[in-house]
From Swiss-Prot:
This is Gem-associated protein 6. PROSITE patterns: AD, SM. GO terms for biological process: mRNA splicing, via spliceosome; spliceosomal complex assembly; spliceosomal snRNP assembly. It holds the Pfam family Gemin6_C. The gene is GEMIN6. It is found in: Nucleus, Nucleoplasm; Nucleus, Gem; Cytoplasm. Residues 7-74 form the Sm domain. The modification Phosphoserine is found at residues 95, 166. The SMN complex catalyzes the assembly of small nuclear ribonucleoproteins (snRNPs), the building blocks of the spliceosome, and thereby plays an important role in the splicing of cellular pre-mRNAs. Most spliceosomal snRNPs contain a common set of Sm proteins SNRPB, SNRPD1, SNRPD2, SNRPD3, SNRPE, SNRPF and SNRPG that assemble in a heptameric protein ring on the Sm site of the small nuclear RNA to form the core snRNP (Sm core). The keyword Coiled coil does not apply.
Length: 167
């Protein structure tokens, strides 16, 4: 078993957003910035920023990893670039105040439509509908989660109506 596989998910997480050199089986060597590690398989996803402004993404299977050596700790700029790598251009960032306003507005809308709604969690950010559906920030139809497809569809339609009415 390799040195990498002997480590656990919390130790693998320490490599995220750092530039590393990975030695894999058959003496293959990879360099790049660690975007993420898989806590189950120990796979590593490396990103390299190319000179033409594009990037390359490489996945290395956890069982093939022999050693991982940190080359560079990275700075805030690199971290931000990696964090927003796969977010779409239309992805909006919301301030805590905006999120609170959206949550309260949606909660009132759902209550007005006689939908039983509660807040759940330590920092009550997630809305819960009848104990079978959750709505996470930023409280859009795509942020709903439920195993009951009928309730999911109806609540998503209500949220869509709310967003249309409030614009």
């Amino acid at each position: 078993m390799s040195e990498w596989m002997k480590k656990g998910p919390l130790e693998w997480q320490d490599y995220i957003y750092k530039e590393v050199r990975v030695t894999a089986s058959e003496k293959n060597e990879y360099k790049g910035w660690v975007l993420t590690t898989d806590p189950v398989s120990a796979n590593i996803v490396l990103v390299n920023f190319l000179e033409d402004g594009s990037m390359s993404v490489t996945g290395i299977m956890g069982h093939a990893v022999q050693t991982v050596e940190t080359m560079n700790e990275g700075d805030h700029r690199v971290r931000e670039k990696l964090m927003h790598l796969f977010t779409s251009g239309d992805c909006k960032a919301y301030s805590p105040e905006d999120l609170e306003e959206r949550k309260n507005s949606l909660k009132k809308w759902l209550e007005k439509n006689h939908i039983p709604i509660t807040e759940q969690g330590d920092a009550p950010r997630t809305l819960c509908v009848a104990g079978v559906l959750t709505i996470d920030p930023p409280y859009g139809p795509e942020n709903c989660s439920s195993s009951n497809e009928i309730i999911l569809s109806r609540v998503q339609d209500l949220i869509e109506g709310h967003l249309t009415a409030s614009q």
